[in-house]
Structure formats: C-alpha cells, structure tokens
C-alpha cells in the first residue's frame, strides 16, 4: 500500500501495451503455425494492439488467433496490414470473419483498424461488414484501407456499412467519432467515390480524408466536394492523382470556405490546369489561413496561374510547403513566381522547381536542334522563287520534316515560338501552292490585294485586306471557300493559316456583318482544331498574344485592328458550342483585364 501512487497509475494507463509480429515474413496456415501468437495473447494481461503486418494468414490460423483475442476487451488497435499475400480469394473473407467475430465476443472497443495493402476487393469487404456495423467500431477513430482494390462495388459496400455504423452508434448513445479515412489506390472511380461521399456527408466528423489515385473524375469530384462542406473539422485533404480538371477544381474551391481548419491540401497531378489554378487562387486568397502544406504540382498550370496562386499565399502565416513543381511555367515564368514568393515572409515554403531544371536541359537540346533546322531552312528560302528541280527537291524534303514535327505536343509557347507570321512561314505556304500563285502573292505582301480577290489571295496574304477586297469575294459560301484553302495544308501550316484567316475576317468585324459571322465561325474552327490536336494551351496563348492580351517575348508589328479582332472574339465566346469552359474562361479573364 505504501507504493500506491495515482501518478504512476495514470502513466501506466497511458502507456500502450501490445504484441507485434511485424515483418516476420511468416506463413501461417494452421493453428500450430500461430501458436507463438496465441501464447503471447494468452500470457499478456493487457493487449491494446496486435500488429500482424508482413505475414500471411490462412483461415485456420485466423480462427486460432481469434480465440486468443476473445480474452482482451481492452483491445483497441487492429494493425493488420499486408497479411494476405498469396492467399486464395475465398480465404480472405473467412479469415476476417473469424477475427471480427472474436472482437465482438471480447467486447473490444476499436480505435484503429488498419487493413491497408490487402487485396480485399468486394469479396474481402463481405468479411468485414458485420464487424463494421458492430459495437466494436462505435469507438472507431481511424479507418485505414489504402491499396485494398475495393473498386466501385467495394466502395459502395463500405459506404453502406459506415452509414449503418453511424446509425447504430447514435441509437446506442455512443455517437461515432471517425476522424481519419485513408482510402488511396482503391480504384473507386466515380461510382465508388459518390457512394463514399454519401458516407462522409452522413458522418460529418472527419479531420483527414485521403483518396489518392482512385480514377475519380468530375462526377465523383462533385459529390465529394459537396460532402467536404459537411465536415468543417477537416485538417488534411488529399486527392492527388485523380482527374479533377478545371471543373473539379472549381467544385473543390467552392468547398474551401467551409473548411476553416484545413492545414494540408494536396491536389497534385489532377490536371486542374491554369483555369483550375485561378479557381483555387481566388478561394485561397479569401480564407484558409491555417494552411501549412499545399501541393498543386504537375497540373499543367502556366505562369499566370502560378502567380495567382502565389498571390493567394499572403494570408498563410503558417505555410511550410508550397509545391508547384512540374507545371508549365517556363524559365521566365518560374523566375517571376520565385520573385513574387520572395516578397512573402513564408518564401522558404516554395519547393524547388526540379522538374523545370530537367525541362530546361531538354529545351537547350531542342534549341540546338532548332538552330540546325533553321540553317537548313534558310537554304530553302534562298530558292523560294526558284523553279529548278534542285530547289523543288530541297523544299519538299524540308516540308516532309516539318509535317512530321508539326503536330508534336507543345510545352512552352512563351519561350519557344515566334509570334509573328514571318517570311519563312509565308514562303513555305507559297511553295505548297503553284509557282504562279506564289509569285503573285509575294507581290501582294507590300500592297493592297488586286481588284478581284480570290480565296487563295485572301488566305495567303501576309496583311489584312480591305472591305472592298472582302466584298469582292463573290462565292456563295465564303466560309467553305476559305476553309478549302486552309485544309490544303497540314500541321502548323494548317493551324497558323487558320488563325490568320480568322484574324483577317475579325479585322473587318465592326464594319461588316458578313465578316463578323465568318470570324465567329473561324474562331470556333480554330479552337475545335486545337482541342482535337491537344494544343489548347499553345493556340490559346498564341491568339492572346496576337490580340495584345498576353505579353510577347519577341516584339512584332501587327497590321490587324486589335479592337475589331477582340470584338469578334467576344461574339464568338457568346456561342454555346464555342470550344470548352477552360478556353472560354481564360479568354474572358484576359479580355476583362484589358478593359479594366
């Protein structure tokens, strides 16, 4: 009695005691195989946890361990990761049923259930359903099911079990306080994610939700975003490597004001792109001051989107990590972002642009390659009006190479493209038409188009034409006639000719209704082609620079009426079928900025 001490008792009570066979790499098939585990359970008075991670458990062995667990009502942590390697699909649910039934008999009160890295699937979930609905889980705080291959069906089964658990716990007077759900790499897809969202919205108690790499698209993202609004205590939210796109980012951004305690948000590799960055930036600028970690890496965000995000960090005094690596900033854009971040007291939070360094090395290689290509191209230009066989052969060789490279994925417009129609470009176009047309259109480059304008002359002129020239296009279907010229070219030639034919019509848009209608149709055709060839960012930036809405690294003079071209673009944006929301919103943002 003299050694009786409340403090020591409290300390002892606070110390977890348990049994671990972690990473023993043992194969347990029979009761005899697990005798050491059973003996430990029988001998140890207090067992708060049992760690079986890294072994493989059969049905009979699970039944024997279950007999030992029945003796421990104080049991609270089932650390059962990676324990069914090499097992038959029929063994897993049976083994889980034995373990779960034992905990129910013992009257255990689980706080942690970790079954990560087990190939459960819907079949394995059948072995968990009874346990998850039982009083054993009324006290559950952490449910860890990473890399369990649940699929949509397994996700649906889990959701229903959690909703039933919530109802059962409330009815028994023990409200469920599940705080953590780790469900990455489960192939939930939209159907499974939507079902899980129903559970999240029902429970309303989550502080951490991790759903990395689950093949979730916009339908699932919308449902999840709505469910997050009902979990105001969320501190960690991780949906890396799902396909949010800008639409999904908008939905998540709408949920952020409902999450004032958020400390970590991770949406890397989610294809949110620049428009998605705008959505996040706008929301973050207004709140979420407690954020410490933000991961938006590898999202194809351009430097404008990166700057918007950095500007939203001004009210984040606790920021420790801001990961924007792997986006499409370019060297100059990266420098601007680093410069803007350096003005903040949390400047050290910005992670290095390691991926950008790799891209810079590739850019240097490509630049060297382009220099070599340019030298070869100059030889062609020297023979632009030469009709000799030698000149024709050289020209054809270069054109073949150009076509091969024309549709390659484009990465950094601001640094790698000249934003003007150069003589080299027009020479190339004219070499693809007849020699007589080529010489005629060269003459057009420095004077007004001839009295009667043809579709060829209209499209291939280096300068915009007059209203008189436009009116002299006397064919019934001007759009079809112009497109027939554009469609004779491929790759970048097709793209650039389409852009500048559009601008030629837009140039006259406020003086001619017919020109305006053509410009609207051609703007749409331009971005339909950009989407089809996966060049949205490239073409968007190119047109923005031609309209003086985006700074251009290379100074150039334009003969086009920018005001008229912008007017036609605004009319095109009103069309419900124009491009997509990302392109529409980007144009609207820049146009509004130009007006302010």
UniProtKB/Swiss-Prot annotation:
Repeat (LRR) residue spans along the chain: 44-71, 107-134, 137-164, 203-230, 231-258, 259-286
Gene Ontology terms for molecular function: GTPase activator activity; RNA binding; small GTPase binding
Compositional bias ranges of the Acidic residues kind: 387-410
SUPFAM superfamilies named among the record's database cross-references: Ran-GTPase activating protein 1 (RanGAP1), C-terminal domain, RNI-like
Topology within the bilayer: Peripheral membrane protein
Coiled coil: none
Tree of life domain: Eukaryota
Known partners and oligomeric status: Forms a complex with Nup358/RanBP2, sbr/Nxf1 and Nxt1. Associates with the nuclear pore complex via its interaction with Nup358/RanBP2.
Protein's name according to its UniProt entry: Ran GTPase-activating protein
Lineage, top ranks: Eukaryota, Metazoa, Ecdysozoa, Arthropoda, Hexapoda
């Amino acid at each position: 009695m003299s050694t009786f001490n409340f403090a020591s008792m409290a300390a002892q009570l606070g110390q977890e005691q348990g049994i671990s066979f972690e990473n023993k790499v043992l194969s347990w098939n029979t009761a005899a195989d697990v005798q050491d585990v059973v003996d430990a359970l029988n001998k140890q008075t207090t067992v708060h946890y049992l760690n079986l991670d890294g072994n493989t458990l059969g049905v009979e062995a699970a039944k024997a361990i279950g007999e030992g667990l029945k003796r421990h009502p104080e049991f609270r942590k089932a650390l059962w990761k990676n324990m069914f390697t090499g097992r038959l699909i029929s063994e897993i649910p049976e083994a889980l049923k034995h373990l779960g039934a034992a905990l129910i008999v013992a009257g255990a009160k689980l706080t942690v259930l970790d079954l990560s890295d087990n190939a459960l699937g819907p079949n394995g979930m059948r072995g968990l359903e009874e346990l998850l609905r039982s009083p054993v889980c009324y006290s559950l705080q952490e449910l860890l099911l990473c890399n369990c291959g649940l699929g949509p069906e397994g996700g649906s089964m889990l959701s229903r079990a959690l909703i039933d658990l919530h109802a059962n716990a409330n009815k028994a007077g023990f409200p469920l306080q599940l705080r953590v759900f780790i469900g990455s790499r489960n192939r939930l897809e939209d159907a499974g994610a939507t079902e899980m969202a129903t559970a999240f919205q029902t429970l309303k108690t989550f502080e951490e939700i991790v759903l990395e790499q689950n093949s979730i698209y916009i339908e699932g993202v919308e449902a999840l975003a709505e469910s997050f609004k009902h979990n105001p205590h969320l501190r960690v939210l991780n949906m890396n490597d799902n396909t949010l796109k800008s639409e999904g980012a908008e939905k998540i951004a709408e949920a952020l004001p409902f999450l004032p305690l958020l400390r970590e948000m991770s949406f890397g590799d989610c294809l949110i792109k620049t428009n998605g960055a705008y959505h996040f930036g706008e929301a973050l600028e207004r709140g979420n001051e407690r954020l410490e970690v933000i991961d938006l890496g590898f999202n194809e965000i351009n430097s404008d989107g990166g700057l918007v995000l950095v500007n939203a960090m001004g009210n984040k005094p606790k920021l420790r990590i801001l990961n924007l690596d792997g986006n499409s900033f370019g060297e100059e854009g990266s420098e601007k972002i680093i410069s803007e971040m350096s003005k903040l007291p949390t400047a050290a939070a910005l992670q290095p642009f390691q991926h950008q360094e790799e891209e810079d090395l590739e850019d240097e290689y490509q630049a060297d390659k382009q220099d070599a290509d340019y030298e070869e191209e100059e030889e062609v230009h020297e023979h632009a009006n030469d009709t000799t066989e030698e000149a024709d052969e050289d020209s054809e060789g270069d054109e073949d190479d150009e076509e091969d490279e024309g549709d390659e994925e484009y990465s950094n417009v601001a640094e790698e493209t000249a934003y003007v129609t150069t003589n080299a470009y027009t020479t190339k176009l004219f070499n693809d038409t007849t020699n007589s047309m080529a010489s005629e259109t060269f003459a057009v480059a420095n004077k007004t188009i001839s009295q009667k304008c043809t579709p060829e002359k209209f499209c291939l002129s280096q300068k915009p034409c007059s209203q008189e020239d436009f009116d002299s296009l006397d064919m019934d279907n001007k759009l079809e006639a112009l497109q027939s010229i554009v469609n004779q070219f491929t790759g970048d030639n097709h793209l650039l000719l389409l852009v500048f034919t559009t601008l030629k019509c837009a140039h006259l848009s406020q003086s001619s209704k017919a020109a305006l209608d053509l410009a609207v149709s051609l703007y749409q055709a331009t971005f339909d082609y950009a989407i089809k060839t996966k060049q949205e960012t490239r073409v968007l930036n190119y047109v923005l620079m031609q309209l003086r809405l985006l700074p251009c690294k290379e100074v150039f003079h334009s003969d086009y009426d920018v005001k008229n071209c912008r007017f036609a673009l605004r009319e095109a944006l009103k069309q419900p079928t124009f491009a997509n929301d990302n392109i529409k919103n980007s144009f609207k943002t820049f146009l509004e900025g130009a007006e302010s």
